């Protein structure tokens, strides 16, 4: 989507809760790269989760 979100904390399950469009969303990585704190691009929306593409 070209938009980005900030990951502050990653849970033990590898997921994060991020703010997007004024609401909390569960986010997960698109590939094998684990989520780490920082800014990530949004690759797509998958149901109620954001799939994050790359970190920058």
Which ranges hold each PLM region?
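Terminal membrane-proximal soluble interaction domains of membrane-associated proteins
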Residues: 2-56
């Amino acid at each position: 989507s070209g938009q980005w979100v900030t990951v502050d904390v990653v849970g033990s399950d590898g997921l994060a809760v991020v703010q997007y469009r004024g609401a909390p969303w569960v986010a997960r990585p698109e590939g094998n790269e684990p989520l780490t704190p920082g800014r990530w691009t949004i690759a797509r929306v998958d149901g109620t989760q954001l799939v994050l593409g790359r970190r920058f």
